[in-house]
Amino acid sequence: TYTKAEPGTHPTNRYNHRHEWRIGVSGDPKRPKIPVAGNNNTSAIQWGELRQVMAGTTSLVGSGSAKGLLRNLDTNVQEGLTEKPIDYDTFPLNDTGGERLTSGCGYPSIHKASALTAIDAYGPHISEGINDEARNEFLCTSSTLYGGQRLVEDKTAIIHAIGLTAQDAWLASARGASVIWSPRSNISLYGHTAQTPLLAKVGVSIALGTDWTASGSMNILRELQCAADLNEKQYGNFFTDRDLWQMATFNAALATATNDVLGQLQVGLVGDVSIFIGTADRKEHKAVVRAGVEDVALVLRGGIPMYGDAAVLEALGADDAGKCETLDVCSVPKRLCTERETGKKLADLETAAGKPIYQLFACGVPPKEPTCVPFRDNEFTGMSAADDPDGDGIKGAADNCPTVFNPIRPMDRGAQPDTDGDGFGDACDPCPLDSNHAMCRKPDLNDEDGDGINNAIDNCSTIANANQKDTDMDGQGDVCDACPTFANPAGAACEFSVKDLRDPARGLRPPLGTKVTIKNLLIVGLRSVKSFGFHARDVGTDLPYSGILVFQGGTKAPAATDGTPLQVGHIVTVTGNFTVFSEQDEVDTVTSVVITGMDAAAAALVTDVKTRDLTGGMQSAAERLENLLCRVKTVTARATLSATDDDFWVSDEAAEMCTGTTPGCTRVSDFLLDGDKNDGSPKYAAGTALTEIQGIVSGFANQYALSPMTLTDIKP
């Protein structure tokens, strides 16, 4: 879909995670959102496909499709093939809103592993970035820990896979997963790319793909050029030309589960063949790896000529009643069968695609081509020097891989990864998980994490823990136990108080997605109109960080598991998943609510605060007061949120006019009153004096508000 746009300009600071350039979540003006227009019509999609045909491509996987030209292997538009479409998944975590986690799997929703049984190939975008958030995506798609799903399997081709460790690569290899590598797009956006020498060493099959034109290559030949340049300058020629060629052919067919019909010159396959012209310095596989579009002599899709030297197509009689036209390509006459495939001549197709549009081909380096030279401002230049041959910014003896590019990523804790501690960096270590190179092991499905312990007896089979430490003796190793000091055998819920979950000073916060049980939880507010559930806190008077939202969802008023309607003052025991939604800590996926007592007087305990206290921010007063019953006194209504929103601003400071989200103001929300109906009630004119307002403190999207539960909570 995104092949019409010409490449954009990327900041020299580079990005750390895809959501930074997608929607600007970093908030850093030096890492802005990149605006990119998609292909908005069939002709634009066909124009992008034609660009790839001229490079020798016959099949692709990606967003959007159109009839003619290429086989779209993720759809049924396969130009004669009847393969099961690959499940192409741009957001396997359903994180389109930019959700990022450094631990736990409390994403909006993760693709179900059970869905893989109905398909032959799965292509999810995973770990597109270089920080902890990117690495966590792999953890949550390779294991069921903390609410994750086991999506990394032998039918999975991980797209990007930049933020992986050596142990992640080992696990992917043990499972038989492959990786789809897009070096130009990765380098231009992040300055880093997937650690392909490491992946290859542990046995991961690597396929090559261009990604989109906004940050990637114009066509597969330019992507091969990029891979070859990295191989020569950054990887010490780790890959052969044959290896690189195979990434664009057989390995790509393996990744899409089409190797039974595509990817090889073999009797019985469908005959997708591209022939290239070699030269004295471009022989054999290098004739493809270092080719330009002018060097493509013939492209056959199922034996049907699509593009090539004019003389060759004419000799084959591939004119199709004038539906193939001649085109000068870098001073070489070519023929291109555009009208036969799209119903339009080339000029008409370009017009129909609309402007602006990226050119069809280039002779040599395309204009505005995104860089393939690794670079991050003030970190590394990607340029070889006597004291830094691989250009990774680490000089001389300090570099644990002097000739293989392995700069330090934000996820690497300030050091080049060396998992086995033998002095050889993972990127260049022939045995990255074994310090004894004479006993170099290969990834084994029976030891997925590579710690030397068979899965069947490993107390943490997806995270390496050779010492098998299990403090609480519950059968789960400490490294994968959300509560290592509280026994929860067989994945039972961990018991926490709300303060355990939320107070940073306690240091007990578990990964998001952890199944938890909270006892002695006092209900202080009900969500009875919309987004049903309740606000509750730990029993007692130690209030900061003691409040939490229990989200029950559905369409019914809050109730216990036995159906008893819940009331303010009920003391309950709750079991569900600890997570974050729109910056608010909460318990969702609730499996049990049991009433254990009643204390209406304690539930009525209100905390008096100043309007300035309810200004947001990490570890602010407002965050400490989330989901507690609070009150502001002697305030003045200053302004409504907007003409169509009943929320209004109040302040207890005479000089504060609340012209925006200023520090001295509190937002009063009608969410608990009427579910944000915006029906004109409650409404207070600017200047109205109010004796007090009490309600529940909410922190939705880090925009704190006081939510009265009844109109009597607002006193004139």
Regions found by a protein language model. Name each.
Residues 1-91, 112-113, 246-387:
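Active-site microenvironment of metallo-dependent hydrolases
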Residues 118-137, 154-160, 164-171, 183, ...:
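Beta-propeller domains
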Residues 316-317, 321-381, 484, 488-716:
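Extended non-catalytic accessory segments flanking core domains
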Residues 41-47, 57-154:
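Metal-coordinating catalytic core of metallo-dependent amide/deamination hydrolases
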Residues 119, 268-271, 569, 688:
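Loop/turn positions that initiate beta-strands
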Residues 59, 121-123, 155-157, 178-180, ...:
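Structural preference for beta-strand elements that scaffold enzyme active sites
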Residues 379-495:
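Extracellular calcium-associated, cysteine-rich motifs in secreted modular proteins
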Residues 143-156, 192-278, 290-305:
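His/Asp/Glu-enriched, well-ordered alpha-helical/loop segment
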